[in-house]
């Protein structure tokens, strides 16, 4: 199952000041989870502000294939009538998650707790990504792999557990996907399922499980970790969910406003969950003018309005423990670092190697081809900022939406235009990115 979309190259050119007030699309992590937990609940769940990108829509299709009723009731407005915990039905065909590792891995967890078999598949990029570390704990809980591609990759057929077992599991890396898969499988198990993390990963699953009525406790573990315990076999009840704007998507117009001289942007309803705001903290350390106002929350998730103005940035060192709170933002942070004065060292980025592409190498290549001095030392990325970027390069996106958007942001302030080989995959997370940036003043051709 591969995308047959024709490549759509695009060029970004030095732009006038970016101005305006926008709400970027709904958060992708929350959107996936709202659909999945709505499907595992009894009764009706209404979702406002759902991200209608390809990744999330593939999760919606999977929930329908597993027996839930999922319907669009208006723009970004959806309704889910769930089947209850353990109530998924055997799907008639393979579940195709396209480019989405999050959707695929979370649904694996939910299916593992049901006595059904389901085949998981995706595009060429998703087929290349590791699944073993998701499947390993699910097998401890009673699920089994009937078939998979070499190395335990997709396409993969998972047989859910007839009698799921609660486990205590220590995650090998800080990964919200591993944690969430175990917790979603644990919903069907009697007793308490516990996940221990050495480094705390994003906690959207825990917050939303509470919102839907699960009994879940999270306590500190060690210096940076968490211990999360879920009581199994709850009756989850449908609930309203307002999806905040995605901080990972807000990162692109935010960095663009910082590097394009004279820019002044307002970004509304951006999620400010502390486990997702590593980029905002880092940009402020670099000297960015970012003001927060209108703080509120919904379904346990805080949000705020941000005013971002063009700023003179300086190089900083980003500690490795910040990685889980900004794992998707390092690409666009590297762009900000290239326009800063001085050296920026981003430490401990090993997880970037197993994303939609090897994002560590791809980020270095994106900068290098545009005249930026960059190095990789172990799992660290080092960018030598000189206050400007020569540009003029052609960036290979490797079917990765975040590389495409980061390169386009860079071209808005570089000396020469930046060419991107393909923008088709931007639709996976931010379908409106190009028209929205144009409305703010971006020069794309």
Curated annotation (Swiss-Prot):
A Pfam match: EPSP_synthase
GO molecular function: 3-phosphoshikimate 1-carboxyvinyltransferase activity
InterPro entries (alphabetical): Enolpyruvate_Tfrase_dom, Enolpyruvate_Tfrase_sf, EPSP_synthase, EPSP_synthase_CS, RNA3'P_cycl/enolpyr_Trfase_a/b
Pathway where it operates: Metabolic intermediate biosynthesis; chorismate biosynthesis; chorismate from D-erythrose 4-phosphate and phosphoenolpyruvate: step 6/7
Assigned protein family: Belongs to the EPSP synthase family.
Domain of life: Bacteria
CDD domains, sorted: EPSP_synthase
Active site, per annotation: 328 (proton acceptor)
GO biological process: amino acid biosynthetic process; aromatic amino acid family biosynthetic process; chorismate biosynthetic process
Enzyme kind, highest EC tier: transferase
Lineage per the UniProt record: Bacteria, Pseudomonadati, Pseudomonadota, Alphaproteobacteria, Hyphomicrobiales
PROSITE patterns attached to this UniProt entry: EPSP_SYNTHASE_1 (PS00104), EPSP_SYNTHASE_2 (PS00885)
EC number(s) reported in the record: 2.5.1.19
Quaternary organization: Monomer.
NCBIfam families documented for this protein: aroA
Residues given in the record as phosphoenolpyruvate binding sites: 28, 101, 129, 177, 359, 402
Disulfide bonds: none
Reaction(s) the record says it catalyses: 3-phosphoshikimate + phosphoenolpyruvate = 5-O-(1-carboxyvinyl)-3-phosphoshikimate + phosphate
Keyword Cytoplasm: yes
Subcellular location: Cytoplasm
Species of provenance: Rhodopseudomonas palustris (strain BisA53)
Residues that coordinate or bind 3-phosphoshikimate: 28-29, 33, 175, 177, 328, 355
Name used for this protein in its record: 3-phosphoshikimate 1-carboxyvinyltransferase
């Amino acid at each position: 199952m591969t995308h047959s979309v024709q490549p759509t190259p695009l060029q970004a050119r030095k732009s006038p000041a970016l101005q305006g007030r926008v709400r970027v699309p709904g958060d992708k992590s929350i959107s996936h989870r709202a659909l999945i937990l709505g499907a595992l609940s009894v009764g009706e769940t209404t979702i406002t502000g759902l991200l209608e990108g390809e990744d999330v829509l593939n999760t919606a299709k999977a929930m329908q294939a597993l027996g839930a009723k999922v319907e669009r009731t208006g723009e970004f407005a959806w309704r889910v009538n769930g089947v209850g915990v353990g109530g998924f039905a055997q799907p008639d065909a393979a579940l195709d998650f396209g480019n989405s590792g999050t959707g695929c891995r979370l649904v694996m967890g939910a299916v593992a707790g049901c006595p059904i078999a389901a085949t998981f598949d995706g595009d060429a990029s998703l087929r290349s990504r590791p699944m073993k570390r998701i499947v390993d704990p699910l097998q401890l809980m009673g699920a089994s792999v009937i078939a998979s591609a070499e190395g335990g990759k997709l396409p993969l057929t998972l047989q859910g557990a007839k009698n799921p077992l609660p486990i205590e599991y220590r995650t090998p890396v800080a990964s919200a996907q591993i944690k969430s898969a175990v917790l979603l499988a644990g919903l069907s198990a009697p007793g308490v399922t516990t996940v221990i993390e050495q480094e705390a990963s994003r906690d959207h699953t825990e917050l939303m499980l509470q919102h839907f009525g699960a009994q879940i406790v999270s306590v500190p573990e060690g210096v940076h970790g968490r211990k999360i315990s879920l009581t199994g076999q709850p009756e989850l009840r449908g609930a309203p969910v307002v999806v905040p704007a995605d901080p990972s998507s807000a990162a692109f117009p935010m960095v663009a406003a910082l590097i394009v001289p004279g820019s002044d942007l307002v970004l509304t309803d951006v999620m400010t969950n502390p486990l997702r705001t590593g980029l905002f903290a880092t940009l402020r350390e670099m000297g960015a003018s970012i003001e927060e106002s209108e703080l509120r929350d919904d379904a346990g998730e805080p949000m705020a309005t941000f005013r971002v103005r063009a700023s003179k940035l300086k190089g900083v060192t980003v500690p490795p423990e910040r990685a889980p709170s900004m794992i998707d933002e390092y690409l666009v942070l590297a762009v900000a670092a290239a326009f800063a004065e001085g050296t920026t060292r981003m430490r401990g980025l090993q997880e970037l190697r197993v994303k939609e592409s090897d994002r560590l190498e791809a980020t270095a290549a994106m900068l290098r081809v545009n005249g930026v001095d960059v190095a990789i030392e172990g799992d660290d990325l080092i960018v030598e900022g000189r206050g400007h970027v020569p540009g003029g390069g052609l960036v290979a996106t490797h079917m990765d939406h975040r590389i495409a958007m980061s390169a386009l942001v860079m071209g808005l302030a570089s000396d020469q235009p930046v060419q991107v080989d393909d923008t088709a995959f931007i639709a996976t997370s931010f379908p409106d990115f190009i028209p929205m940036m144009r409305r703010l003043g971006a020069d794309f051709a």
